[in-house]
Amino acid sequence: MFFDREEEIERLLEDISYEPNMVTFVYGPINSGKTTLIQEFLKRTSEKYVGFYINFRKTPVANYEEFSRVLFSFDSRIKMIKDVISILGKVNPWIPIPREVLNDILRDKEPINAFSYLREVLEEIRSSGKMPILVFDELQVIKDLKVNGSLIYQLFNFLIHLSKEAHLAHVFAVTSDSLFISEIFGNAKLSGRASYFPVYDLPEEKAIEFLLRLNLSEEESRLVVEYFGGKPSYLVEAPKHRKHLREWCERELTLRAREIRRFKSNLLLEFMDEEEVEVEELSEEAINLVNANILFYDPLRGTLRPQGKLELLAIRKVIKG
């Protein structure tokens, strides 16, 4: 469910009004609404754009064949590259491909072949007078996949070529993995070739407005925000628990505190009085808490903070005992 991200939508639409020049990484805390935002953005693009939304969460990706099958889908209507244009919609969940070309890509296990076909499709789209937009959601899923070296860095090099060098397509990579973003941010090869677009939880007043639109009362809305802040996933769930709203809020807090209590971490003590702390580098302790989705690391700001308001309250509950 999409609500009041107009400022972010306008920024994204403005970005694509210029010639492609960067790979844009869309990142933020878990369940902050990144996927919903990017899908709404694609819907709102004009007819001069063709979107591809590739979701690496929709199926396990443990090898090159599975990667290729997420990226491409066989379509019997395609005999030649130029046939692709006639079957594309405004937003497409994969890149259509002739069966024999897909078979060759799967057989050869050479990423360059997959990338070459994708480039040909994008060139055909540009020749038709339209601009492609490539979106890869949860790209970090393939970060450990090896195909003649690191697949993800081969993909990054290709995406940089598409955007910064060939100016063939706007490219977005979406992730909730802040350690992955930290690696990207610290990669010298991506310096000057990547931009970063943070998506945080909704501000509390906007969250209350959202809940009021879901027919919760002012009092009920403020209660939900008191526990969950502007975390969209909890805001959407709240109306289902309206009959026992406070009990639901307390139960979620208790469960989260129980999970956090397993971590004997002195680092968490810093959040007793602070909502965000600056860090020069991530300790092993911090990495474990980020991996457990308790803390969120923002490499652009150089800060650590709880993944959401519920985590902040749970941390303080654990500290107080």
Swiss-Prot record:
Q: Cite the binding residues for ATP.
A: 28-35
**A single Gene Ontology molecular function, please?**
ATP hydrolysis activity
Q: Which InterPro entries does the record cross-reference, listed alphabetically?
A: AAA+_ATPase, Archaeal_ATPase_domain, ATPase_dom, MJ1010-like_2nd, P-loop_NTPase, WH-like_DNA-bd_sf
Coiled-coil annotation reads none
Q: What keywords would UniProt list here?
A: ATP-binding, Nucleotide-binding
Pfam families named among the record's database cross-references: ATPase_2, MJ1010-like_2nd
Mind telling me which Gene3D superfamilies this protein's record contains?
A: P-loop containing nucleotide triphosphate hydrolases, Winged helix-like DNA-binding domain superfamily/Winged helix DNA-binding domain
Say which family it is in.
Belongs to the archaeal ATPase family.
Protein's name according to its UniProt entry: Uncharacterized ATP-binding protein PH0541
Q: Which organism is it from?
A: Pyrococcus horikoshii (strain ATCC 700860 / DSM 12428 / JCM 9974 / NBRC 100139 / OT-3)
